[in-house]
Design a protein with these regions (language model features):
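Extended alpha-helical interface modules used as scaffolds for assembling large macromolecular complexes
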Residues: 16, 21-223, 227-229
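Amphipathic alpha-helical segments of the small helical/lid subdomains adjacent to P-loop NTPase cores
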Residues: 1-23
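Short intrinsically disordered, low-complexity coil segments enriched in acidic
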Residues: 1-5, 213, 231
Length: 231
């Protein structure tokens, strides 16, 4: 889970990242060593230019082989470069429709990449991200919702001007990234029998349902949660 998960063929045997495994043995600690080989600045810039939905990488994206087998870096399709750089790998294959599922190979790559991504979508620096994530974890586990919401505003209110497109999707991407970093059981836009909630977060002691409203009120969001049966 930490260092394995690489597959280069639908029927291929899973492979470990040898660099990370060797470093873990040397340090006698299950750390995050992937980013010692370099930071994906170019890839993140490519993602920004293409306006690629980061949630697809987090949840796993289904594509044809042609979607990730190109060797050119194109802003309209950053997936080949992301795949060839080792940040996503083959996670599944449906032979009936010839669709591949691509996703992060393991937790080391997932959390390392998303942690590096935060400053590109918010004004929260890379050094500050870990601090806020730790605080988020404490606040949700203790049920301190007010403190959690105040801290979440730091990520939303500090969105750089050139990225502030005032769409629910953009804010939801930030939220999705934050909670993936938390390592919580997290699903975005979870569908229920009568609709879908924007986000549902499960902790050991509580379930939090989030409904995003840029132009609406909190009362309207709560009413929608009740009426559509998100709980």
């Amino acid at each position: 889970r930490q260092y394995d998960g690489y597959h280069f063929h639908p029927e291929g045997v899973g492979m470990f990242n040898p660099f990370s495994v060797l470093n873990a043995f040397d340090a006698e600690e299950m750390g995050y060593y992937w980013f010692q080989t370099g930071t994906p600045t170019y890839l993140v810039d490519l993602l920004k230019q293409s306006d690629y939905d980061i949630r697809l990488l987090i949840d796993g994206v289904e594509v044809l082989a042609s979607a990730f087998s190109e060797y050119r870096a194109e802003t309209n399709n950053p997936l080949p470069m992301i795949y060839q750089s080792g940040y996503v790998t083959i996670k599944g294959y449906d032979d009936d429709v010839k669709l591949y599922t691509l996703g992060f190979p393991n937790d080391e790559v997932r959390y390392g990449f998303l942690n590096f991504l935060v400053p590109y979508y918010t004004n929260v620096s890379n050094d500050e991200t870990g601090f806020h994530i730790a605080k988020f974890m404490r606040e949700l586990k203790s049920g301190d919702v007010e403190a959690f919401m105040e801290r979440l505003k730091i990520f939303f209110s500090g969105i750089p001007y050139e990225l502030s497109d005032d769409t629910e999707c953009h804010y939801q991407v930030i939220f999705h990234v934050v909670f993936t970093l938390l390592g919580q059981f997290f699903r975005s836009e979870v569908r229920s029998s009568r609709g879908r909630a924007d986000a549902v977060v499960h902790t050991p002691t509580a379930i939090y349902v989030f409904e995003f409203k840029l132009d609406g009120t909190a009362d309207a969001a709560l009413k929608q949660i009740d009426e559509k049966g998100y709980l």
